[in-house]
């Protein structure tokens, strides 16, 4: 489903800002070291200006009801001075590429979108330049051309673009009177699994490092981002496992002997993001929820806490931490699940436990 908003929320835009400055951080021993992490910018006035300019550009060209924005499971990139845009719904498995310009602009956007790489750090969603072409396209095996071929180079992508422009070109009228020319591309039926398998080596590595179930990591990744490495949310959660720098990020830094919090570029790197998300699961298990005895009950609590926080989970059972643990340990794992799925004050958290538990089942035997 396409997602439109009249105004682009500041918190949706900010996570895509590039953090280029280099800073020093302090290790647990007090030694100054060169850090690969940057701190969140304090120049909110500058960010407000950039956000306003970006929003104004889109409103002025497409109309106030046509501002399509990126989200956890949606990639959106504007090009050609904002007259062309590509939208990938990783949840629905649908790619829409549209332009207010001519077919050459549409062709170019098709090619660059299909051949873009997997590293979000090389993509600036604020400027209207083309996405760099990669020798290892992220969408490879997720999209097939008219002959069933994987789209892995410019020649195949250009041939497929010609096919789309000749056979599947459509138009629609905007409220401002302009005409949009567009094409839609369906991803393969198992596109979610194809993306998941891209991260199998990393997930196995982090699962072993922190003693977390592979299936749990995959289940959370699917629900959080549908394996969209470009993912960002309204809460400034970033990447595949939707890590929030100022909360989970700070906890993770403490355990790594670092000060501050990770920057967006760091968390957009898949290996870093999966490491951070999995470490946070281990923190929940070993520290915040360590008083739960039954491993299945603890898993349910961990899942719910990943979404709403450990404190909120314990308060479902009792306002007192010790009493909450005692109450949980008196219940069967099925009963713990029912309580969290029905009595948690957050509807999102209630649904989250159900979604992750179901998604996790699909990855128990992944090879």
Curated annotation (Swiss-Prot):
Pfam families from the UniProt entry: Mltc_N (PF11873), SLT (PF01464)
SUPFAM superfamilies: Lysozyme-like
GO cellular component, one term: cell outer membrane
Catalytic activity, EC: 4.2.2.n1
Covalently attached lipid (N-palmitoyl cysteine), positions: 20
Signal peptide (residue range): 1-19
Tagged with keyword Secreted: no
Function summary: Murein-degrading enzyme. May play a role in recycling of muropeptides during cell elongation and/or cell division.
Protein name as catalogued: Membrane-bound lytic murein transglycosylase C
Protein source organism: Haemophilus ducreyi (strain 35000HP / ATCC 700724)
Gene, per the UniProt record: mltC
């Amino acid at each position: 489903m396409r997602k439109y908003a009249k105004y682009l929320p500041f918190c949706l835009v900010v996570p895509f800002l590039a953090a280029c400055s280099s800073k020093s951080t302090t290790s647990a021993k007090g030694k100054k070291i060169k850090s690969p992490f940057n701190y969140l910018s304090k120049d909110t006035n500058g960010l407000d200006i950039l956000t306003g300019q970006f929003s104004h550009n889109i409103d002025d060209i497409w109309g106030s009801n046509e501002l399509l924005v990126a989200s956890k499971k949606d990639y959106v990139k504007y090009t050609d001075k904002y007259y062309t845009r590509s939208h990938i719904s990783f949840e629905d498995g649908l790619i829409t590429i549209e332009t207010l310009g001519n077919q050459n602009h549409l062709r170019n956007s098709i090619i660059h979108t299909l051949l873009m790489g997997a590293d979000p750090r090389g993509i600036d969603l604020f400027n209207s330049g083309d996405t760099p072409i990669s020798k290892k396209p992220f969408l490879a095996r997720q999209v097939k051309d008219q002959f069933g071929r994987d789209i892995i180079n410019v020649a195949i992508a250009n041939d497929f673009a010609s096919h789309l422009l000749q056979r599947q070109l459509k138009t629609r009228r905007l409220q401002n009177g302009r005409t949009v020319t567009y094409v839609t591309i369906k991803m393969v039926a198992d596109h979610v699994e194809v993306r998941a398998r891209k991260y199998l080596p990393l997930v196995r590595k982090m699962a072993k490092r922190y003693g977390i179930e592979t299936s749990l990591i995959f289940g959370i990744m699917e629900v959080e981002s549908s394996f969209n490495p470009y993912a960002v949310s309204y809460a400034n959660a970033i990447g595949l496992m939707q890590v929030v720098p100022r909360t989970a990020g700070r906890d993770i830094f403490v355990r790594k002997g670092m000060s501050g919090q990770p920057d967006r570029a760091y968390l957009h790197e898949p290996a870093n993001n999966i490491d951070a998300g999995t470490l946070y699961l281990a923190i929940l298990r070993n520290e915040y929820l360590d008083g739960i005895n039954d491993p299945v009950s603890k898993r349910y609590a961990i899942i719910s806490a990943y979404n709403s926080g450990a404190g909120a989970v314990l308060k479902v059972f009792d306002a007192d931490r010790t009493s909450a643990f005692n109450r949980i340990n008196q219940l069967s794992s099925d009963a713990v699940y029912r309580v969290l799925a029905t009595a948690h004050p957050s509807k999102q958290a209630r649904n989250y436990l159900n979604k992750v538990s179901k998604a996790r089942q699909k990855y128990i035997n992944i090879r």
